[in-house]
Amino acid sequence: SEAIGEKRQVRLVDYASSHSGVVRDRLVEPFDFTTDYNQVWCYDLEDGRNKLFKTMRIGRVEVLQEGWMAEMKHVKGFVDVFRFSGPERYRVKMELDVRARNFMVECFPLAEREMTMVEDGKWLLDTVVCGLMGVQSFELTVAGAKIVESERINN
């Protein structure tokens, strides 16, 4: 957060990327955190793109003397309740029993605002997600959670 406030570049040392499967340093301009501080929005100076970096995958942070060079390109994207971002959008409805609902809210607190109780002990999550990986993983690993509808939304 020091680098954000001072508008300085940082080196994310030993960042472990699930996307590439590689652990390496990243030269970035951090400009904001997600709501839960699990991820940081950065402008990646190598790729010339805005990206989310998960804080738990960063070995350490080196704050550099260099100031931001690409501030006009800093743009936050959409992040779904499962903490995924990307260009794909799906409207998803998932039925949850009490146990699944509680687990979802504990793991993904932002999902709570998109849930409604439909009957005693039954909840419906109605949300937009960036791809289906997060919601399908939840359905496969948590008893009492079932996707009842998913539809791709045009961007």
Segment roles from a protein language model:
Residues 1-93, 98:
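Core beta-strand-centered patch of the WYL/Sm-like small regulatory domain
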Residues 80-155:
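Polybasic (Lys/Arg-rich)
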